[in-house]
């Protein structure tokens, strides 16, 4: 057998749950990179991870590097021998260094001459002698922001390390990892099974840990088990568990032997908005809330414990006692907050600074209110509701509930607005103003919500750029990139008839004399246009398509999107590459013209059949294209323009544009200028690759 399975395990103290997957994936990626660098073949590799261990398993790993022949070139033959044909000192020194005589050297003939060469056979190194060093290098490259030392050890790692195991098949690999000598000892569960045991073979790792150590080392298996058992537990009480993947990942990273249990809380707490209860259950306690078929929160929750108890009722009771005070806090905050309207909290916003040069939160909501009304007027939304929602948009930040449970901002604003008797549009806008919160999140769809969300983001963008604090490098303390993408997505996905230039100008005017950067509006526009490029690239749109549209500088995002879609479709047409090349040729010709470009086409000067045909085709298309351009139906316009391919090809085949006759030349330049202008109504397709 010339291959074996490899197991490497690092036994540690409890690893940070939110970092566990990343650590394990990085460990595997780093180690397989080491294998590739060492030219060690293997079939597959996987990672395992539990709260107190990181492990990797490599299947069918070659037991040694393959032997290889290394060409060692010596001096040129012309300088390797003297006039009498005897080896020179240079040749003899080279041969001696390679363990051969000059006579044993081979000859290599190249186009630059003939050389002495020695094809040396290099035997592959045994894998077992390489593993420890490769594993250590893989660990050294793990993404650990704050490593720690322990005991008298000088070694640093994310948590103290207690065991290291490296097995190639049944053979123990000698060496150290993070200062710990490799041994067969593997630690089991803290409270169940064997505290530690000897691992005989790499292939026994998962089974032995599960049977002897009461540890499910396979992260994905553990995660799947928790999900399945939680779903079953919820179904038993007539509900559906809210199993968010990020929480499921965290819970799977906290337990080695997951046991799913169901608990309950008093129904009186259901009078509190469910979002606050869910926040404390998921965020603080790592519980899975349960909802009925109508989406209403049930007075139950599902939790995962790390031990099989003889008395699970005691564990359930303990968790119920832990969560009760948190729910009682939420109830108290809610009842206290209801005593004051959101409007009554407006003066308190004056005590909170938004930004030193941009004023307080009260200043900000005043600007948001005015800008939201301006946007609503342009989109056909209720401007009165938009202004009201903008004014109240940050008042829930002053409530006890949001101060305690920060992730409920906006959501609690919606509930309090309803209790205050605000319109439903205002209430919904209170929650949706922060959308989209992350990549993949939905955007607000209601008109008032869109107006407030846009106003909030644009106020921040223009304000921060206006005081000269634009993002630099990776640093973006005000999350301006996310705000910019949010602005674009809201406008594009709702097809809103808004122009960025107008929005930026209005936002800048509302800041008054606060802004010190005279170029703020231009910089914000450039920033937004750059986000367009990043956003479309993430969606898989070709860079050349994006650049073709950017060349026209459309500042209406919905219009920009229509152009992107049209050019993307145009690229799929058979005629696109030829027309792109022709447009590039036209651009190059026109760029060389000094002074103003001729624009008038004189039909009597169209002497060649090919130019007559092209002019006729353009005349035929223009009345059809005009309404398409006016209605932003760019896809249909480019589809019609694709029909020009044969006429354009024939024109360049038969017609000399730069004719000696000045009148003919200018007429042909005017024809080409007209041709290019039709395409430029959509994009500069000469930039398509």
Curated annotation (Swiss-Prot):
Domain of life: Bacteria
Record carries keyword Aminoacyl-tRNA synthetase: yes
Reaction it catalyzes: tRNA(Gly) + glycine + ATP = glycyl-tRNA(Gly) + AMP + diphosphate
Compartment(s): Cytoplasm
Gene of this entry: glyS
Keywords: Aminoacyl-tRNA synthetase, ATP-binding, Cytoplasm, Ligase, Nucleotide-binding, Protein biosynthesis
Protein name stated in the entry: Glycine--tRNA ligase beta subunit
GO biological process: arginyl-tRNA aminoacylation; glycyl-tRNA aminoacylation
GO molecular function: arginine-tRNA ligase activity; ATP binding; glycine-tRNA ligase activity
HAMAP family: Gly_tRNA_synth_beta (MF_00255)
Source lineage: Bacteria, Pseudomonadati, Pseudomonadota, Gammaproteobacteria, Alteromonadales
Entry keyword annotation includes Heme: no
Broad class of where this protein is predominantly found: cytoplasm
Pfam families named in the record: DALR_1, tRNA_synt_2f
UniProt subunit comment: Tetramer of two alpha and two beta subunits.
The enzyme's E.C. designation: 6.1.1.14
Similarity section: Belongs to the class-II aminoacyl-tRNA synthetase family.
The species this protein was found in: Shewanella baltica (strain OS223)
Entry's Gene Ontology cellular component terms: cytosol
